[in-house]
Design a protein with these regions (language model features):
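Short, surface-exposed basic-aromatic patches at helix termini and helix-loop junctions that form
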Residues: 116-121, 146-150
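Sec-dependent N-terminal signal peptides
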Residues: 5-14
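A short helix->loop->beta-strand "cap" motif at the edges of active sites that frequently abuts
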Residues: 122-126
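Short, glycine-/small-residue-rich phosphate/pyrophosphate-handling segment
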Residues: 128-161
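A mature extracytoplasmic/lumenal domain signature
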Residues: 28-29, 102, 131-134
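N-terminal beta1-alpha1-beta2 submodule of the flavodoxin-like/Rossmannoid cofactor-binding fold
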Residues: 18-98, 105-107, 116
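N-terminal secretory signal peptides that target proteins for export/translocation
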Residues: 1-2
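Generic recognition of short, well-ordered alpha-helical segments
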Residues: 35, 109-113, 139-143
Length: 163
């Protein structure tokens, strides 16, 4: 009988630990956000997942000064959803950090693709945006995510720039 009680308590502890698991999902165009995501995952003992575009971005795609570059065209169209290479199963996570570089003051459209692909599984999760940027804050990106996905439980975001 005592063995069963100990086993039940052990299983309950394992289930509680699984329910409290954390995922760090991120998109990184140049490696800056990837480095921040790795540090964040290590700090929180979290699983790391890279949100990758089906078609990788080239340097020309990322030229924000060129109105015809891929990133410029994507950001001009609020309905644009770049195709993701592969999705991850988010059902086992309670807390998910969502990371990205700031593009045009907000998250890149590939983040919308990832969120859209994972709805409604994200609806009972705690989502914490984090971003990297050379000059912008995260406030506009936070407001955009909360407005675009009002049914999701967003916490205040983190700006993780190298200083």
């Amino acid at each position: 009988m005592m063995k069963r009680i100990v086993l039940a308590l052990f299983c309950a502890a394992c289930i509680t630990n699984m329910n409290a698991s954390t995922l760090v999902a991120y998109f990184s165009a140049t490696g800056t956000t990837k480095a921040a995501a790795k540090q964040l995952a290590a700090q929180h003992n979290a699983r790391l997942w890279e949100i990758e575009p089906a078609q990788p971005y080239t340097a020309a795609d990322l030229d924000w000064r060129n109105d015809k570059s891929r990133s410029s065209l994507e950001m001009k169209d609020p309905e644009e959803r770049p195709t993701i290479k592969q999705c991850t199963d988010v059902t086992h996570y309670d807390t998910i950090y969502v990371g990205f570089p700031i593009w045009w003051g907000i998250c890149p459209r590939i983040i919308n693709s990832w969120i859209d692909n994972n709805l409604p599984q994200l609806e009972n999760k705690t989502l914490i945006p984090f971003a990297t940027s050379g000059s912008s804050g995260i406030e506009e990106a936070e407001a955009y995510l909360k407005k675009t996905y009002p049914t999701l439980k967003w916490k205040n975001g983190l700006l993780l720039n190298k200083r």
